[in-house]
């Protein structure tokens, strides 16, 4: 047993060095907990940071946008506006549909928001139209969030009405019940119904009106309680044939008598089994289909939700006829898994590179094994803590662990290098471990807490960006803390038992060659450092110039919000002239689909035409383009989009707007392009005046592309101008006029057919194929007070006008959204500034307010807080270092290394053509924590040499630089190689990871070169300043 000197206490490491079994078992426990935690952690693309969002949809077939706004949307908005915790309320009122999107504060639980929404709907019920077919329906879903899965249901033998009926009752309901599913929408609109198409000439010839027919149908088809008979011995329930189930039964319905002869419905109308809404259609590739879009609840885990759906699909499809085919056209989790797999591979690559650099420096297998154990142990142990914090394995947490690879090895390297130095001097391994660990303990604590201090401001970032990076910061901090524990426990224990003078002195040809190389490098560094110390003011000017250069680079570098990801899915909006009909739009859509499907990168396509909860008007269509996997196509998504738009430009009469689907969705409205800018006013007239002027100017800006607006005020309207006096003399009310028009042209739902499985509608309309266009209005007949039949044309004139196709509100006021993309040679920051400058030139009136929305608003918020975030990180680190060193001066010396890192990071981003986005800013903040390690290691040893060996400050810092050169170089290269796989990543999701790697690699290279010279110079200058200050105070005290 070795006899230890009294001074060899080993500090906090002593207990673990002396008890190797306990230390080993403790580390095994950390390893097992981490492995169990890894298996229990869910997988997702990004941390779950969705705003609690609820969508409320109300359908009122036949109602104009103006009626939907005043009769449906406005009463609901007034009730919703009184809810607490509401962040933003937007609405879209179009022909027959009202969609209100409610976005709540991040702190409000979604279930609480749901209760408030239900209460508000109940309060507004009495204010809504009495003939509303169905009450408002809410869904816990963000309409702008792309579906997690899209399925197409087709059949070669069955009509689409039967297919939709089966899908709705057998498939969609079951999927809706899966935990995490927020909404299942069926696009294609082929719900079964009995359609009654009146022959206007026939009923007019018989002296009947559409109101007569409607009354007859509603009275003939009822489903109500009839009671029961309760006798002395038995009870009998009453039933009757009050329901009509088929088109044939309705065809035989007697609606009136004339001269004693019955007039049946089939005599004056075409009665057929059809679709409830004939102005809806969906296609999968070129085949008509029922398209099922599955959206998740905000906050639900996308991977587990998609897995549950796939597990249930075989069981659901077995219940369908063999002629019905269910195809999964898109699954966002495929790319998410691929992205996470690529990030995990880069994590393993980073570990391998770090271990390789350790061996290169230590040139000793036992010495390499020690940090080779410490690194994975620290990372794996982090998973156990992540489980307790409800984190997930996602791109950001894996990026944090990848970056942590370079951090966690630093502590082990510093400990090993210091212990090895004492062994090489002749100390016994155990004594060297105790002495070296005790000596380096304070340095390790300084490194750890100063690094964690940098991450603290990230935890206080506001809004969704702060939530997004909270998991990143905490995961990284936990890994760093675990590495500190491992470095002060396991690492010195392993050094005491695995290192020896023989093992350290044992050299092969590679060891000898590398040793000579390092000796030459250290000698050259020593000569260069001596020259630099002789010219301190020149070196100081270089340090100050880096500070100035970092500010200039910060001002001029292109700025963005979040990297545009290639997730293999493109969302598209097809726009046609505002007067386009459903048939015309469907034809144009099929032309565009043919062009898109010819592109070699496209795997499948779904498209939808018609007005529903997501599509506002008949002149627009929604498309989802699913690309082939990244390794099966030559181009990334942005190039594919450019190619598709060029190809579709050849199709006359349509405009196509495309944007890649992103994992992070901040918007609440389905947009044509990536970024949005809104104009809000107190009236639609103000918008109609200023929107065209602003659009004209924005379309001329080179910083913007694909500029479009949702302002569509040229929809054709047939305005029925009723002579109220004439109508009153005949006993005809405006309600009679509206009823007649609605029954003729509104696809009016007049009755319900009840079955055991579902409910179906009876739809009444005029057969416009007999009398098409505006001439159909001449066939409308009304009943006067004396029972006579009066043509509508005798009391009204029809005028053709223009009106908006949809009316949009933001927080209850009219709004229009201008959408835009940013060309490749400009940044989002350039675009935002150009829009703001253009707005100023217009001199908008005070009743017009403008605001960026969605990602652009988040970009402005993040950009505004970035400088303060960096300042907060620097201040936090200064406070921690000041407390640790009990000095106001030494923390400034350490922080003087930061500008060099900023210069390197910003230069690297500019050279690589990357924007300064949120991911890159996080990299710069991390650099603040990394590069100061060099200064800490130098200053710690210089202070110790001054204090213990009585050396002069110059000799102390010179010796410290030479002694710590190798660990400084080793730790910097380890951090650099930890970030290198992120910088060089090319797989799925590489766009998200690359800016972090580029910034860190560039910052580490420049800071490594400069701080090795600037830090000792600044240390000496501040030492002289401290001496001068002390002498001044001493002189004043003597004089006093």
UniProtKB/Swiss-Prot annotation:
The keyword Cell membrane applies. GO terms for cellular component: plasma membrane. InterPro entries: AcrB_DN_DC_subdom, Acrflvin-R, Multidrug-R_MdtB. The chain crosses the membrane at residues 16-36, 347-367, 369-389, 396-416, 440-460, 472-492, 537-557, 863-883, 888-908, 911-931, 968-988, 998-1018. It is a multi-pass membrane protein. It is found in: Cell inner membrane. Keywords: Cell inner membrane, Cell membrane, Membrane, Transmembrane, Transmembrane helix, Transport. It comes from the Bacteria. Pfam families: ACR_tran. GO terms for molecular function: xenobiotic transmembrane transporter activity. The keyword Plastid does not apply. Part of a tripartite efflux system composed of MdtA, MdtB and MdtC. MdtB forms a heteromultimer with MdtC. HAMAP family: MdtB (MF_01423). Belongs to the resistance-nodulation-cell division (RND) (TC 2.A.6) family. MdtB subfamily. This is Multidrug resistance protein MdtB. It comes from Shigella boydii serotype 4 (strain Sb227).
């Amino acid at each position: 047993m070795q006899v230890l000197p009294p001074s060899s206490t080993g500090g906090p490491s002593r207990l673990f060095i002396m008890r190797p079994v306990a230390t080993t078992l403790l580390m095994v426990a950390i390893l097992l907990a981490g492995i169990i935690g890894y298996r229990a952690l869910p997988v997702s693309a990004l941390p779950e940071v969705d705003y609690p969002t609820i969508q409320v949809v109300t359908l009122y077939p036949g109602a104009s946008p103006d009626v939907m706004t005043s009769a449906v949307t406005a009463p609901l908005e007034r009730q919703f506006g009184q809810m607490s915790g509401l962040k933003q309320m937007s609405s879209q009122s179009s022909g027959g549909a009202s969609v209100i999107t409610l976005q709540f504060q991040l702190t409000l639980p979604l279930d609480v928001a749901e209760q408030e929404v239900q209460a508000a709907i109940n309060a507004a019920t009495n204010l809504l139209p009495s003939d509303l077919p169905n009450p408002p329906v809410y869904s816990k879903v963000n309409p702008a969030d792309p579906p997690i899965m899209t399925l197409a249901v087709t059949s070669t033998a069955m009509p689409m009405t039967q297919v939709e009926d089966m899908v709705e009752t057998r498939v969609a309901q079951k999927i809706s019940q899966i935990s995490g599913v927020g909404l299942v929408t069926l696009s294609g609109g082929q719900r079964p119904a009995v359609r009654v198409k009146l022959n206007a000439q026939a009923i007019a010839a018989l002296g009947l009106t559409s109101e007569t027919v409607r009354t007859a149908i509603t009275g003939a088809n009822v489903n109500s309680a009839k009671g029961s008979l309760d006798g002395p011995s038995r009870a009998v329930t009453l039933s009757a044939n009050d329901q009509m189930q088929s088109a044939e039964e309705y065809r035989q319905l007697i609606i009136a008598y004339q001269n004693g002869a019955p007039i049946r419905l089939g005599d004056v109308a075409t009665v057929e089994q059809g679709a409830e809404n004939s102005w809806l259609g969906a296609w999968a590739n070129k085949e008509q289909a029922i398209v099922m879009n599955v959206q998740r609840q905000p906050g639900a885990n996308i991977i587990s939700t998609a897995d549950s759906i796939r597990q249930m699909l075989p069981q659901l499809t077995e219940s369908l006829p063999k002629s019905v085919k269910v195809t999964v056209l898109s699954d966002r989790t495929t790319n998410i898994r691929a992205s996470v797999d690529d990030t995990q591979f880069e994590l393993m690559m980073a570990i391998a590179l770090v271990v390789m650099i350790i061996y290169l420096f230590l040139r000793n297998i036992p010495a390499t094994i020690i940090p080779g154990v410490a690194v994975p142990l620290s990372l794996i142990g982090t998973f156990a803590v992540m489980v307790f914090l409800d984190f997930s394995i996602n791109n950001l947490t894996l990026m944090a662990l990848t970056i942590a690879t370079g951090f966690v090895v630093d502590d082990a390297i510093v400990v090993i290098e210091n212990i090895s130095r004492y062994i090489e001097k002749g100390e016994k391994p155990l004594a060297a471990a105790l002495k070296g660990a005790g000596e380096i303990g304070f340095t390790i604590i300084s490194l750890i807490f100063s690094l964690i201090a940098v991450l603290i401001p990230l935890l206080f970032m506001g809004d969704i960006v702060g939530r997004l990076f909270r998991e990143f910061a905490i995961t990284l901090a936990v890994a760093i803390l675990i590495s500190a524990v491992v470095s002060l426990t396991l690492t010195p224990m392993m050094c005491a038992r695995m290192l020896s003078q023989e093992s350290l002195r044992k050299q092969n040809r590679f060891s000898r060659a590398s040793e000579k190389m390092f000796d030459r490098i250290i000698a050259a560094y020593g000569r260069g450092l001596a020259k630099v110390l002789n010219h301190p003011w020149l070196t100081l000017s270089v340090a100050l110039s880096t500070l100035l250069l970092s500010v200039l680079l910060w001002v001029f570098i292109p700025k963005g919000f979040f990297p545009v990801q290639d997730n293999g899915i493109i969302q598209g909006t097809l726009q046609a002239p505002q007067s386009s009909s459903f048939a015309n739009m469907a034809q144009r859509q099929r032309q565009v689909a043919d062009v898109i499907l010819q592109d070699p990168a496209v795997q499948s396509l779904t498209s939808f035409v018609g007005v529903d909860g997501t599509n506002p008007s008949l002149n627009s269509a929604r498309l989802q383009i699913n690309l082939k996997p990244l390794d099966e196509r030559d181009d990334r998504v942005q190039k594919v989009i450019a190619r598709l738009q060029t190809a579709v430009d050849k199709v006359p009469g349509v405009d196509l707007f495309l944007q890649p689907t992103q994992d992070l969705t901040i918007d609440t409205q389905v947009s044509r392009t990536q970024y949005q800018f809104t104009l809000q006013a107190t009236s639609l007239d103000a918008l109609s005046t200023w929107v065209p002027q602003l659009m004209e100017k924005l379309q001329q800006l080179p910083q913007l592309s694909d500029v479009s607006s949702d302002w569509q005020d040229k929809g054709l309207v047939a305005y029925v101008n009723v002579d109220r006096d004439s109508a009153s003399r005949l006993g005809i009310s405006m309600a009679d006029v509206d009823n007649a028009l609605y029954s003729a042209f509104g696809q009016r739902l007049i009755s319900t057919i009840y079955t055991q499985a579902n409910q179906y509608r009876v739809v009444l309309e005029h057969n416009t194929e007999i009398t098409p266009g505006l001439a159909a209005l001449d066939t409308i007949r009304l009943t006067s007070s004396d029972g006579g039949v009066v043509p509508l044309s005798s009391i009204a004139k029809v005028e053709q006008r223009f009106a908006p196709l949809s009316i949009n509100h933001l927080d209850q006021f009219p709004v229009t959204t201008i959408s835009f993309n940013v060309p490749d040679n400009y940044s989002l920051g350039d675009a935002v500034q150009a829009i703001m400058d253009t707005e100023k030139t217009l001199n908008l009136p005070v009743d017009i307010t403008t605001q960026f929305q969605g990602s652009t608003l988040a970009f402005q918020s993040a950009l505004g807080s970035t400088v303060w975030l960096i300042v907060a990180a620097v201040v936090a680190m200064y406070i921690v270092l000041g407390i640790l060193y009990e000095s106001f001066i030494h923390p400034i010396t350490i922080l003087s290394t930061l500008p060099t890192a900023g210069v390197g990071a910003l230069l690297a981003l500019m050279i690589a053509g990357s924007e300064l986005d949120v991911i890159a800013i996080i990299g710069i903040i991390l650099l603040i924590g990394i590069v100061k390690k060099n200064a800490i290691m130098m200053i710690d040893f210089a202070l110790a040499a001054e204090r213990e060996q009585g050396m002069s400050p110059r000799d102390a810092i010179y010796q410290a630089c030479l002694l710590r050169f190798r660990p400084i170089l080793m730790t910097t290269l380890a951090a650099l190689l930890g970030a290198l796989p992120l910088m060089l990543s090319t797989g799925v999701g590489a766009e998200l990871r690359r800016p972090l790697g580029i910034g860190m690699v560039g910052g580490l290279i420049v800071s490594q070169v400069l701080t090795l010279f600037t830090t000792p110079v600044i240390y000496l200058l501040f030492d002289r300043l401290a001496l001068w200050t002390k002498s001044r105070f001493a002189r004043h005290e003597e004089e006093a």
